[in-house]
Every structure is written in structure tokens, then in C-alpha cells.
Amino acid sequence: MKTTTMSQLRQWKQEKRKFATLTAYDASFAQLFAEQGIQVLLVGDSLGMTLQGFDSTLPVTVADVAYHTRAVRRGAPHCLLLADMPFMSYATPELAFTHAAELMRAGANMVKLEGGSWLCDTIRMLAERAVPVCGHLGLTPQSVNIFGGYKVQGREEVAANQLLQDAIALEQAGAQLLVLECVPVELAQRVTEELTIPVIGIGAGNVTDGQILVMHDALGITGGHTPKFSKNFLAHSAGDIRAAIKLYIEEVEGGIYPAEEHTFQ
């Protein structure tokens, strides 16, 4: 099996070929996802909520993410593997480089940072030192206390224009990939068309180059509130996890998921 690379993702964008991604936190699920055809995985700081039982991602540490990154890498050696930089782990460019290096040594191919134009110096520093970066705009969970909860971002014209400018700035600083979370579909389309780098959506409609879901949401095992953008693929697959993942991939690649009911206007 060939290793998935950023060059492939850029080619997929040019070919308008959509791709599906998932979060993963251990070797067993990572292997299962890879065997069904998932080629990009994220060790998300969402592990703080899905695995550790916290009510936000803020308590997650770099050591936590590194531990799970090593496990996922062992289970899916050929996937393009992203690792989240936890809250305050990139407060300065120097701190970001130290922690990014730790995650790269753990097996990540790329690190993901949440934030807008203020991150450009950090992204530039990392890119110059051979650390690939994925940006993250829209609803950035590490900023939950500023947002006052998990709310759709970019609905007002001023906010939408700022997000678009932030996306352009992140790409110019050296980001190779962008995650866009919980934004109106019209804004997601503007960002996806404006950028030359691939854009992965979550709660951003079916107009982005790729889609990502937290694995627990895709399998319908999330306790409590279920996000509007999520779909329980396991329930549509007679309880067969492998079939559920294949269905997720098929619906993303076919532009079926996310449907209108999963989309914000």
C-alpha cells in the first residue's frame, strides 16, 4: 500500500475529487479505518471529550496527543496523519516548534493549529523548519470560552470576510491544509474556491474538498448532544462498523454527505 501524501490531496483538489477523513485515537480503529479506504486521519484534541470525559478540549496535553499519535501511526502506517496542537501549546512560535517536533517524532505527518492571522508568524516558522501545518478556522473548539459555546461562525458579512482573509493569510504563511468548522455553506464555498490548498469541512456543507468527522459521531456512540452536521453511519449499516465506514466514504466521495439537513445557512 502506498503512503498518502499532501501532493495527492492537492491533486485531488484539482481533479475535484472529494475525500473522507476521520479522527482516530488507537491502533485498532486506525487499522480498521485504513483497511476500509480512509487515507487521512486526525489525532484530535477531541480525545479530551470522547476518551477522557472532559466537557471541552482545553485539558488535553501535548503528551496526550503524542501518546495517541504513536498508537494511530502503528495501526495505520500508510495514512497521512495529522495531530492536533492542544490549547496553549503554540502560544509562541518557539513553543509551537518544540511541541510540533514532539508530535512529528510521535508519527504525525502534519500538525493542526486553531486560529486566524495572528498565527501567521508561527506557521511561517514551522513551515521553514520542515513542519507541515494544517490551519483550522470557523468554530475553533479551543476558543469555546470566547465564543460563549459551540456556535456557527461567519454568519455576519464582516465575520465572513474576516474568515476569508484569515484563510488566505494562513495559506500565504505556509499552511498546506485547512479545516473549516461550522460555517455557512456559502462561506465554505468561497474559501474553498479562493484557496489553492485543500479545505476539509466539518459542518461546512458538501462544497469543501474533503470532510472530517469525529469517529464517535460517525458511529453514533457520542453521549449527550449530537451535532447537527453529524450522521450515524453505523445505524445505516445494520451495526456493521466496516460497512459504516465504507458508506461514509462513498457518501462523501459522491457528494451525498453532508446533505442539506447537516448544513448551516
Swiss-Prot record:
Record's GO cellular component terms: cytoplasm
Pathway in which this enzyme or protein is active: Cofactor biosynthesis; (R)-pantothenate biosynthesis; (R)-pantoate from 3-methyl-2-oxobutanoate: step 1/2
Molecular function via GO: 3-methyl-2-oxobutanoate hydroxymethyltransferase activity; magnesium ion binding
Binding site for 3-methyl-2-oxobutanoate: 45-46, 84, 112
Keyword Cell membrane: no
Catalytic reaction annotation: 3-methyl-2-oxobutanoate + (6R)-5,10-methylene-5,6,7,8-tetrahydrofolate + H2O = 2-dehydropantoate + (6S)-5,6,7,8-tetrahydrofolate
SUPFAM superfamilies hit by this protein: Phosphoenolpyruvate/pyruvate domain
Cofactors demanded by this protein: Mg(2+)
Chain residues that bind Mg(2+): 45, 84, 114
Residues at the active site: 181 (proton acceptor)
Compartment annotation: Cytoplasm
Listed NCBIfam families: panB (TIGR00222), PRK00311.1 (NF001452)
Known partners and oligomeric status: Homodecamer; pentamer of dimers.
Protein name: 3-methyl-2-oxobutanoate hydroxymethyltransferase
UniProt source species: Yersinia pseudotuberculosis serotype O:3 (strain YPIII)
